[in-house]
Curated annotation (Swiss-Prot):
N-[(R)-4-phosphopantothenoyl]-L-cysteine binds at N145, R175, A177, M186. Homotrimer. Interacts with CYP2 in the plasma membrane and nucleus. The gene is HAL3B. This is Phosphopantothenoylcysteine decarboxylase HAL3b. The record marks C178 as: Important for catalytic activity. GO terms for molecular function: FMN binding; phosphopantothenoylcysteine decarboxylase activity. The lineage of its organism: Eukaryota, Viridiplantae, Streptophyta, Embryophyta, Tracheophyta. Involved in plant growth, and promotes salt (e.g. NaCl and LiCl) and osmotic tolerance, probably via coenzyme A (CoA) and endogenous proline accumulation. Catalyzes the decarboxylation of 4'-phosphopantothenoylcysteine to 4'-phosphopantetheine, a key step in coenzyme A biosynthesis. Favors seed germination and helps the onset of flowering. Required for roots development. GO terms for biological process: coenzyme A biosynthetic process; photoperiodism, flowering; positive regulation of response to salt stress; response to abscisic acid; response to cold; response to lithium ion; response to salt; response to sorbitol. Keywords: Cell membrane, Coenzyme A biosynthesis, Decarboxylase, Flavoprotein, FMN, Growth regulation, Lyase, Membrane, Nucleus, Stress response. The active site is at H93, C178. It comes from Glycine max (Soybean). Mainly expressed in roots, to a lower extent in stems, and at low levels in leaves and seeds. It is found in: Cell membrane; Nucleus. Pfam families: Flavoprotein (PF02441). Its cofactor is FMN.
Amino acid sequence: MAGSEPVSAEGESMAVDAAPRKPRILLAASGSVAAVKFANLCHCFSEWADVRAVSSSGSLHFIDRASMPKDVILYTDEDEWSSWKKLGDSVLHIELRKWADIMVIAPLSANTLGKIAGGLCDNLLTCIVRAWDYSKPFFVAPAMNTLMWNNPFTERHFISIDELGISLIPPVTKRLACGDYGNGAMAEPSTIYSTVRLFYESKAQQGRAVVTLR
């Protein structure tokens, strides 16, 4: 199993100190064909941050695990159950939540969007979301067919997750995997990476300014 290595929850906050560590980024993929780009996304982030990855069962149909960075562990639903044997053992979705400074779901499918908006937690990914500390940054990059994107439920669901403080990295208009042309394609991995990194470094700079003022 890819996720057999234990997770350390040490250093839950994004505190900036004299010798700052790398940011800890938890990347997650849900079951959209855009998950074919997930390995590329992990490579983008792993050059800058410590990365852990989570995949839903649906996303595994599209992720090329052989292309994943060697230093990035990919956790699956199987790991959630196999890592717990008895009372007192660590719970994977809690440990990953504690470990991460930032969570990014890319791609976010219509199905997983609906689950998050409704508070459902029936797999490793959605259990992490349900247990997430929303004082920490959380980004999603949706990917779905244009008609699914334009469905009235999608707007309602995004209103719900926006109230939690989850930030949207909007989809783009292009030829989709199904052959249709329209909005709903996931933003490019480079765009997702630059958005998250710019946010993190901006917050870190603000933190240093506060320390200096004190």
